[in-house]
């Protein structure tokens, strides 16, 4: 089995001035993920997503959008397709890398989804250091929040930066998907988007692994990640499945976004209906990852 990792850094109207930062970010994530693939697809996805959580170019981890209360509030999920084990966290304020906590939930908890203070308590029990929310806030987002507080609603120009995700196939045929997000700008505190919802923003089976990005409420209605997986299981190529799912998102649910998918055979697909989507592909046969927006 030839290992492969796909990365996305969000589907939106990335301005020219931010293209280079996004290309660099997804490239670094792909490199981190490929190193992890030497061990397993789980390690690869965790490493890739963690890299983007640490990069303020993306709406995940440090530098995420602030909610109405002026706080960073994060969601993440990871799922292994063959065994269908998964872990998810939502609305956490004190976790630097929520994808790492999601993995702890997957491996060491008897439930799938933990939120808020309960998730943070579990993190402490698992040896994950809690951080101050202030440490996740950057000045750019503090200034954005001040403007949005005056406006009372997010203007179109503030829908910037995106959810991050990765899907991977390892040498043993393991398929894993992971997604992490800071959510929408000036969101209602406690809002959970599509990203950590299995079947909506993220999904994996023995056939494929999928991570989505875009406007969460529409993606949840479309059950987008599961739609991609169902199409693959019905015999569609990865690319066709991705494109058809994005088409459904737009036509039936008036939604915008994108997705990445990799199958058990190493076939992969990338599709989006926004002006741009940061993404990268890295296979064992490549000397370097291929990244684009």
Regions found by a protein language model. Give the residues of each.
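Alpha/propeptide regions of enzymes that mature by internal proteolysis
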Residues: 1-293
């Amino acid at each position: 089995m030839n290992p492969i990792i796909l990365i996305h850094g969000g589907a939106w109207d990335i301005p020219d001035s931010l293209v280079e930062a996004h290309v660099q970010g997804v490239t670094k994530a792909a490199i981190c993920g490929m190193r992890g693939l030497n061990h397993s697809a789980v390690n690869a996805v965790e490493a890739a997503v963690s890299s983007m959580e640490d990069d303020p170019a993306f709406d995940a981890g440090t530098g995420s959008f602030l909610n109405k209360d002026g706080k960073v509030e994060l969601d993440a999920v990871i799922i292994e397709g063959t065994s269908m084990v998964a872990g998810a966290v939502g609305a956490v304020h004190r976790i630097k890398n929520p994808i790492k906590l999601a993995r702890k939930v997957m491996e060491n908890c008897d439930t799938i989804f933990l939120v808020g203070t309960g998730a943070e308590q579990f993190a402490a029990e698992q040896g994950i250091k809690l951080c101050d929310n202030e440490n996740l806030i950057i000045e750019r987002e503090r200034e954005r929040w001040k403007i949005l507080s005056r406006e009372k609603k997010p203007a179109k120009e503030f829908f910037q930066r995106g959810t991050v995700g990765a899907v991977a196939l390892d040498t043993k045929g393991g398929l894993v998907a992971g997604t992490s997000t800071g959510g929408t700008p000036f969101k209602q505190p406690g809002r959970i988007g599509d990203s950590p919802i299995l079947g909506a923003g993220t999904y994996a089976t023995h056939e494929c692994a999928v991570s989505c990005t875009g406007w969460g409420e529409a993606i949840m209605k479309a059950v987008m990640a599961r739609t991609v997986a169902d199409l693959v299981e019905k015999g569609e190529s990865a690319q066709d499945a991705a494109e058809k799912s994005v088409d459904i998102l737009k036509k039936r649910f008036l939604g915008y976004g994108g997705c990445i998918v990799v199958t058990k055979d190493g076939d992969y697909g990338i599709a989006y209906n926004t002006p741009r989507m940061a993404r990268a592909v890295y296979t064992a046969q490549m000397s370097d990852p291929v990244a684009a927006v």
